[in-house]
Amino acid sequence: MPSDKDIKSPAQPKKEEEIPKSILTRISSPPPILNQPDANIIHHPQPQVPQSSLNIPGIKLSPQISTSLENREIVMAGGAYLKERMESPDSLNHKPTLLQPDKSESIPSIDYTLNPPKESQHHKSPSVHAHFYVEETLRPVRNRSRSGSNSNNNLTPITSPQHSEPSSILNKDAIKSQESLRATTNSISSAAASNQSTPRSIISGGGGGGGGANTATSSNSTTSNTALAAQGTTTTTTTTNSNSNTTTTKGEQNSNIDPRLPQDDGKFHVLIGVCGALSVGKVKLIVNKLLEIYTSDKISIQVILTKSSENFLLPETLNVLENVKKVRVWTDIDEWTTWKTRLDPVLHIELRRWADILLVCPLTANTLAKISLGICDNLLTNVIRAWNSSYPILLAPAMDSHSYSSSTTKRQLRLIADDMPWIEVLKPLEKVFGSYGDIGMGGMTDWNEIVNRIVMKLGGYPEDEDEDEADDSKDNIDESAIIDDDDDDDDDDDDDDDDDDDDDDDDDDDEEDPPQQQSTTDNSKDETTNL
């Protein structure tokens, strides 16, 4: 008997009307060829094959897909998984995996759709699918003013209808701050109303005298105290700001906010640039001497500090310069804090326009190289780079002897002397450097000589008022002496005239005397004749 292997099924002809299963799954209705069978198609009878011969191991037959409209079912975009999750009885009690500490921190978007979290969580961007969209809880919006103050920061929380409860929890602090602000404004308005009503009570009292005045003052004090208690720290900050504003308006020295500097104030304007060297302490002596010579009514001094010079300048010295000597001190950061928009003044341009003379003392090798090459990477070098050549610049080098005597330094000094005639380099001194005991050139010029050179550049030493008064008194004395001499001469002339008159009288008397003598002689002759 032949085995199953020997039995071969006859080759079945390929049906032309058979459609692939992939196409059947795509189309919504069966093709017309299935609904309208063609009569020309001949069906060949197939021989009966034993069932055992068709059961070929390893081949699984897939069930036939139904294409009828009645059996079709609408499935959501989430698929069967979402449907099972929605139909499961414990889906309402299901907790997101993000809230369970034992599980992974990641949570699928389906969990967000079914059970959105009560606490706000950060999403980089919402899902592109409509049914996966989770509306984020927005934080309170603040309006920030240009000055950075919090006066206009009225909280306007934005909440979504789905997450109203979490947003209310998040905005609890904002609501408290709003309530405190409202209480403060109400107390201030009530205090203002009471202050306005008290003068009316005093006027209506008529001749109440001192009692009515005392009552009004007491009510004012109580309302002011309540207003201060309600305001709290806000009142403290406002009072400090007002005090700072009043102090800045009194004197010339103020905080480095507005770089617009007065130019036509009738004073000499001296700008001092300070670099990082041990001779920084001499700047205080130079400032004191200049103020002693000219007084603060005739001279105004401002200082520019480089980044390295701040390491050598003591806080006590800086405090004395700013608060006692009323010297405004600028740093590199002020270049950007004073300039915010295009129309704001530029600090290094304002300093260049303000200054009558610039002194760089002490001058390091680093800043010397920047000046010679035109590098401007800080506030001081920006001022020098934009300097008006009609005004002088004095440089007082202070460096090591080997640095000063190097060929690079000589070349830079020669370049400045040839191409920048408005810059004068003061010759350094020979001194002992550091603890090594080296003696060489490179020490900064004596500060008295620097002061003398500044005074000469500004037009010379001013005359003292005492000397002027002494000179005026001497002139007055000399004039009075000259006037007295003139009076004496006039008196002498009068005396001479009197003498001349006396002489004339004598001459007249002499002329009248001879006739009398003749008459007497005639009388004597007559007497003799009578005898």
UniProtKB/Swiss-Prot annotation:
<feature type="compositionally biased region" description="Acidic residues">
    <location>
        <begin position="481"/>
        <end position="514"/>
    </location>
</feature>
<feature type="compositionally biased region" description="Acidic residues">
    <location>
        <begin position="462"/>
        <end position="472"/>
    </location>
</feature>
<dbReference type="GO" id="GO:0071513">
    <property type="term" value="C:phosphopantothenoylcysteine decarboxylase complex"/>
</dbReference>
<feature type="region of interest" description="Disordered">
    <location>
        <begin position="1"/>
        <end position="42"/>
    </location>
</feature>
<feature type="region of interest" description="Disordered">
    <location>
        <begin position="88"/>
        <end position="127"/>
    </location>
</feature>
<keyword id="KW-0539">Nucleus</keyword>
<feature type="compositionally biased region" description="Gly residues">
    <location>
        <begin position="204"/>
        <end position="213"/>
    </location>
</feature>
<feature type="region of interest" description="Disordered">
    <location>
        <begin position="461"/>
        <end position="531"/>
    </location>
</feature>
<keyword id="KW-0963">Cytoplasm</keyword>
<feature type="region of interest" description="Disordered">
    <location>
        <begin position="180"/>
        <end position="261"/>
    </location>
</feature>
<protein>
    <recommendedName>
        <fullName>Protein SIS2</fullName>
    </recommendedName>
</protein>
<dbReference type="GO" id="GO:0005634">
    <property type="term" value="C:nucleus"/>
</dbReference>
<feature type="compositionally biased region" description="Basic and acidic residues">
    <location>
        <begin position="1"/>
        <end position="20"/>
    </location>
</feature>
<dbReference type="Pfam" id="PF02441">
    <property type="entry name" value="Flavoprotein"/>
</dbReference>
<dbReference type="InterPro" id="IPR036551">
    <property type="entry name" value="Flavin_trans-like"/>
</dbReference>
<feature type="compositionally biased region" description="Polar residues">
    <location>
        <begin position="155"/>
        <end position="168"/>
    </location>
</feature>
<dbReference type="InterPro" id="IPR003382">
    <property type="entry name" value="Flavoprotein"/>
</dbReference>
<dbReference type="GO" id="GO:0010181">
    <property type="term" value="F:FMN binding"/>
</dbReference>
<feature type="compositionally biased region" description="Low complexity">
    <location>
        <begin position="183"/>
        <end position="198"/>
    </location>
</feature>
<feature type="region of interest" description="Disordered">
    <location>
        <begin position="139"/>
        <end position="168"/>
    </location>
</feature>
<dbReference type="GO" id="GO:0015937">
    <property type="term" value="P:coenzyme A biosynthetic process"/>
</dbReference>
<dbReference type="GO" id="GO:0004633">
    <property type="term" value="F:phosphopantothenoylcysteine decarboxylase activity"/>
</dbReference>
<comment type="similarity">
    <text>Belongs to the HFCD (homooligomeric flavin containing Cys decarboxylase) superfamily.</text>
</comment>
<feature type="compositionally biased region" description="Low complexity">
    <location>
        <begin position="214"/>
        <end position="249"/>
    </location>
</feature>
<comment type="function">
    <text>May stimulate expression of certain genes that are periodically expressed during late G1. Also modulates the expression of the ENA1 ATPase.</text>
</comment>
